[in-house]
Amino acid sequence: MKASRFFIGTLKEAPADAEIVSHKLMVRAGMIRRVAGGIYNYLPVGLRSIRKVEAIVREEMNRAGAIELLMPAVQPAELWQESGRWEQYGPELLRFKDRKQNEFVIGPTHEEVVTDIARNQIKSYRQMPVNFYQIQTKFRDEIRPRFGVMRGREFIMKDAYSFDKDHESLKESYKKMYDAYVRIFTRIGLEFRPVAADNGSIGGSGSHEFHVIADTGEDAIAYCPTSDFAANVEAAEALPLLASRAAPAEAMQKVATPGKAKCEAVAELMGIPLERTIKSIVLATDNEGAEPTIWLLMLRGDHDLNEIKTAKLPGLAGHRFATEAEIVEWFGTPPGYLGPIGTKKPVRVVADRTVANMSDFVVGANEVDYHIAGVNWGRDLPEPVVADIRNVKAGDPSPDGKGALDICRGIEVGHVFQLGTKYSDAMGATFIDESGKAQPMVMGCYGIGITRILGAAIEQNFDDKGIVWPEAIAPFEVVLCPMGYDRSDAVREAADKLYADLAAAGIDVILDDRGERPGVMFADWELIGVPHRLVIGERGLKDGKIEYQGRRDAEATLLPADSAAAAVAEKVRAALAR
């Protein structure tokens, strides 16, 4: 490729609405341009990197035995109504009607469509296992698209769907996809972690997310530095921080705490550690034609409620936070002074594992400006229902028993799910098993955010000059910067020969023949992030030398002109092989 025949749309300044590094650099490097909120044009530089990501994904999916197909972006409402997600999905699902008033959606995902394919095409256990995948444009009507390609409304995704005869076979399909994802992200050159995760709205029983580690990540990841354990904070098990409950050492007493509605303020006033206070959270579950059930959840004062874990407890599916009016009706006081002792109406108490092992703790007195100290289970309160209802914190013991947890930020770029029979049952996707009986197909689904990978890679790989691409997904591997290409025959001939030699060696090379000043050329290619640069000048050629500099190198080095192409080609191959 020659730069004079390519489009280079670099900018000196980032748009005012760009908040994070990847968004700023993708715009400045001429990779993307905004069309509407969360919708982008991918310019030639950006598209080249997208195609390289897609190529790696295709190679590894094919290697894992998946079969590529292509499903429509537009899907009929009937399929979503069959699965039940027409009502469940919410406003993120972009719905519209055609001229005949038929309802459709622009697909954010394709479980319904692929299940429709399977129920019509797969009849026997002999046709399974099978795994279909596609690389397709998706649309989710995000309420607040931001961060460029990180949280866009339109995006490119690889989604795959496996169909198996039973759950044991699904585990094998799942493992193949898990391993394929590890290979994909390793080949791309990302620092990543697979983490145990919650299935969310997709459904099913088991899942892992793949996170690129970056300070700008939206997700909190709990991991153990001394083991392989990693999980999304929303899914990580929080072990009790006390091995057993100590015997009571204090008498229960009511304490005046004027104006102290927060655990931190109460602890400071009483001169006790925050860890001895209890945070009370009131939830409600509605009962048709009757009063709601009111729940009091008890957490240590320095801990936070995990709503995902809470929703999985018996009776708490579909819970909501109680209104202030309900709180006053059941407890006789507004939030800030709530506790399990002396409620006006019966409430169901759930204590976090750590709280269940506490002694001599402090709770609200259900009276404004008062708390109760020296509270103990068994003596002052009946034994509670005990459950893991909190988020883990840095320093907590790792669930695998191999050290303490740390917390980092991650950008989710992939997710694998064991769906089970959720969609098969809802949509009647059955097959005939070995005994001649109809059984529901057992499904898995596996997604990778193709365009999001670009943003995540940049968040890990940049400096004050621009992007520093991992070799495998750089728009070009090598750039040739001739000094005076349009003025010097020697420079032009040397540059053209280098270009031909590198291209013949299979290197993705671009020759900057625009005739720009050296400073402009260097700034453009450092911003775009090409990993290797060769500078050809008359002075160097007289000495038989060409200047080489890697994008990550602090200084340039000189290479013999007659072997520069071979030397750089070897550097590229070595980088891709890592």
Swiss-Prot record:
Catalysed transformations (reactions): tRNA(Pro) + L-proline + ATP = L-prolyl-tRNA(Pro) + AMP + diphosphate
Any one cellular-component term (Gene Ontology): cytosol
Main EC class the enzyme belongs to: ligase
Keyword Nucleotide-binding: yes
Annotated PROSITE patterns: AA_TRNA_LIGASE_II
Enzyme Commission number(s): 6.1.1.15
Keywords annotated in UniProt: Aminoacyl-tRNA synthetase, ATP-binding, Cytoplasm, Ligase, Nucleotide-binding, Protein biosynthesis
Presence of keyword ATP-binding: yes
Family recorded in the similarity comment: Belongs to the class-II aminoacyl-tRNA synthetase family. ProS type 1 subfamily.
Quaternary structure and interacting proteins, as annotated: Homodimer.
Protein name in the entry: Proline--tRNA ligase
